[in-house]
UniProtKB/Swiss-Prot annotation:
It comes from Gloeobacter violaceus (strain ATCC 29082 / PCC 7421). Keywords: Chlorophyll biosynthesis, Iron, Metal-binding, NADP, Oxidoreductase, Photosynthesis. HAMAP family: AcsF. This is Magnesium-protoporphyrin IX monomethyl ester [oxidative] cyclase. The lineage of its organism: Bacteria, Bacillati, Cyanobacteriota, Cyanophyceae, Gloeobacterales. Signal peptide: none annotated. The gene is acsF.
């Protein structure tokens, strides 16, 4: 996916540059989505739709008079990391907006209840993306979202994979944001940017979205039963775990600026997300197994070695790639555990 970035110079003219980001735009089987039978949990979906329509955060994303001034007070050593966070987050939110909006449009006639839920979530994602993009604009930089929408590239995922992935993504987002907010409440001296003041309410949007996908999965038990689906659940749980941990364990990271220990923060978020997912999934990862933590740390170390070999020949990288693949396989082979006593998502 190519993102057009706009950067204003000291005069009134703008220069444009482009940066290549990893594709994060998805499409799916809309006909299969339209045929979902949610009648067994219709009351739960209607209750959640009522929450969506209440739009509790309608007035939340309003910048106060001191927002820009505080944004410009950021320590120069953290500015690049903050911009990276804003760009990555904005891209992710905009991706969600496009997917949810398209699903809502396609389901409007065949499955109006689901369509209305997706419409409300697309509203939230658009609001988040716009807020993040405006924060980038404080540094004379921002994503050209209209151009991005035209140039987007799609990766096809089956509906059940969309459900697994978005459920975990929204729940991880919730636990990430609330953990950061609570930490900065205790240590306000580490609040390097005013954006973090908004995380307490913001994370509730993420939580409601996660609850919605949890309801979909609970309403379609065939997506959670059987050995093949159980393997897919393990795959997605481990993929999200690895992606987060490997990214957060990089030496120069935003969490240092916030006064957080990146490894401890990542594990706490993963532990909470893992337990939360047990309300929906038939199994969870055994994060308390000492071997799991050892293998996870080993993967993070090997990933850093691999990045250090960037630009080297494939032959030079092969031993590290093989070691990383082997360690990931060992993680996958660790026996999962049963979730805590089952609860309804809502």
């Amino acid at each position: 996916m190519v993102d057009a970035l706009r950067e204003a110079n000291t005069a009134s003219q703008s220069e444009r540059r482009e940066t290549l980001l990893t594709p994060r735009f998805y499409t799916t089987d809309f006909e299969a989505l339209a045929k979902l039978d949610i009648s067994a949990m219709e009351a739960d979906f209607e209750a959640l739709l009522a929450e969506f329509q209440a739009d509790y955060n309608r007035e939340h994303f309003q910048r106060d008079a001191g927002f820009v001034e505080q944004a410009h007070q950021i320590d120069p050593q953290w500015r690049a990391l903050m911009l990276e966070f804003l760009e990555r987050s904005c891209t992710s939110e905009f991706s969600g907006f496009l997917l949810y909006k398209e699903i809502s449009r396609r389901l409007k006639a065949a499955n109006p209840l689901l369509a209305e839920c997706f419409k409300a979530m697309s509203r939230d994602e658009a609001r988040h993306a716009g807020f993040l993009n405006k924060a980038m604009g404080d540094y004379d930089l921002g994503l050209d979202l209209s151009n991005l929408a035209k140039q987007k590239k799609y990766t096809f995922f089956k509906p059940k994979f969309i459900f697994y992935a978005t459920y975990l993504s929204e729940k991880i987002g919730y636990w990430r944001y609330i953990a950061i907010f609570r930490h900065l409440e205790r240590h306000p001296e580490n609040r390097i940017h005013p954006l973090f003041n908004y995380f307490k309410n913001w994370c509730q949007d993420e939580n409601r979205h996660g609850d919605f996908f949890g309801l979909i999965l609970k309403s379609q038990p065939q997506l959670l039963k059987g050995p093949i689906n159980r393997l897919w659940v393990r795959f997605f749980l481990l993929s999200f775990c690895l992606t987060m941990y490997l990214n957060d364990r990089k030496p120069h990271n935003l969490y240092s600026a916030l006064g957080l220990d990146a490894s401890h923060y990542a594990m706490e978020v993963l532990r909470q997300t893992n337990l939360d997912s047990g309300k929906v999934f038939p199994l969870i990862l055994d994060l308390d197994n000492p071997r799991f933590q050892r293998h996870l740390d080993r993967c993070a170390d090997l990933n850093l070695q691999l990045e250090a070999l960037s630009g080297k020949s494939p032959l030079a990288r092969l031993p590290v790639i093989a070691a990383l693949a082997g360690t990931i396989a060992q993680l996958f082979l660790l026996k999962p555990v049963a979730p805590p006593a089952p609860e309804m998502v809502r």
